[in-house]
Swiss-Prot record:
Its EC number is 2.1.3.15. It comes from the Bacteria. NCBIfam families: accA, AccA_sub, PRK05724.1. Residues 35-296 form the CoA carboxyltransferase C-terminal domain. Component of the acetyl coenzyme A carboxylase (ACC) complex. First, biotin carboxylase catalyzes the carboxylation of biotin on its carrier protein (BCCP) and then the CO(2) group is transferred by the carboxyltransferase to acetyl-CoA to form malonyl-CoA. This is Acetyl-coenzyme A carboxylase carboxyl transferase subunit alpha. The keyword Transferase applies. The gene is accA. The keyword Lipid biosynthesis applies.
Length: 319
């Protein structure tokens, strides 16, 4: 699988290319294979050290690029690796089925849970089908329907957030985009079941927040969460989208900064180089975190759960 190296990963990409070339020669190299094996081993050590150095010192803009990586695991990838018996549920029962939101019932180590998440798509046709992960009102109303179903059947809700934002098209606005988002915020704040939200890529504005109100809000190590994209911010402040790196630094959109501000609860570690390098390992890290948090929340009665969530919301922005 091609890893689609980003601009700041060029030195790593060059080393990986050398290693792959030597491996190819080694496979057909006869007597020189032993010497090549030693050289490959040295280059692999050098590559590992370079990765550790690079990813231990990422800026906000580099993190934003990783959050958008085209091979990053999406909701359906987490479902595949971390859950069992997934049964997808479709439609908002009012207008249409928005493929930018996927959801349904699954089992997490035997527990029935409701899963809801954004889905961007990988190939061109799927990206168009999923509207590039930007939901319309019917997507958020589908999510609302599933959340209310989960409450009726006393199932915990797990959400996966990865969107540039809610779709801003004319049709979406005509069908009540802002109302759909606002209704979700209201309903999620009062659900009588545990809700765990996970930002796994881009957390873009109200489009992310519409499935992001919960008892725990987690972010992956290289995900982002912000009111606007760095490019959008730069276009407004400086009339120049090329200043997106400066905007990213100023916005405080990274997981460590948001945890420092107490806007999120936990940061989930990614494999070295980012979640796209090992979907199975990333899903395992996610699963372990979900199980621990669910065990904590399942000890609480409804009143305590709601009071704790209310206090969490009221503390946002409090200094």
């Amino acid at each position: 699988m091609s890893l689609n190296f980003l601009e700041f990963e060029k030195p790593i990409a060059e080393l990986e290319a050398k290693i792959e070339a030597l491996r190819d020669v080694s496979r057909h190299g006869g007597d020189s294979a032993v010497d090549l094996d030693k050289e490959i081993e040295q280059l692999e050590k050098k590559s590992l050290e370079l990765k550790k150095k690079t990813f231990s010192n990422l800026g906000a803009w580099e993190t934003a690029q990783l959050a958008r990586h085209p091979l990053r695991p999406y909701t359906l990838d987490y479902i595949k690796h971390a859950f069992d018996e997934f049964d997808e549920l479709a439609g908002d029962r009012a207008f249409a089925d928005d493929k930018a939101i996927v959801g349904g019932i699954a089992r997490l180590e035997g527990r029935p849970v409701m899963i809801i998440g954004h889905q961007k798509g990988r190939e061109t046709k799927e990206k168009v089908k999923r509207n590039f992960g930007m939901p319309k009102p019917e997507g958020y109303r589908k999510a609302l329907r599933l959340m209310e179903m989960a409450e009726r059947f006393n199932m915990p809700i797990i959400t996966f957030i990865d969107t540039a934002g809610a779709y801003p098209g004319v049709g979406a606005e005509e069908r009540g985009q802002s109302e759909a988002i606002a209704t979700n915020l209201k309903v999620m704040s009062g659900l009588k079941v545990p809700v765990i939200c996970n930002v796994v890529g881009e957390g873009g504005s109200g489009g992310a927040l519409a499935i992001g109100v919960g008892d725990y809000v987690n972010m992956l190590q290289y995900s982002t969460y912000s009111v606007i994209s760095p490019e959008g911010c730069a276009s407004i402040l400086w009339r120049d989208s090329d200043k997106a790196p400066q905007a990213a630094d100023a916005m405080g959109l990274t997981a460590p900064r948001l945890k420092e501000l107490e806007l999120i609860d936990e940061i989930i570690e990614e494999p070295l180089g980012g979640a796209h390098r090992d979907h199975a390992q990333m899903a395992a890290n996610m699963k372990a975190n979900l199980l621990r948090q669910l065990e904590d929340l399942e000890q609480l009665d409804h009143e305590t759960l709601l009071e704790r969530r209310y206090q969490r919301l009221m503390n946002y922005g409090y200094c």
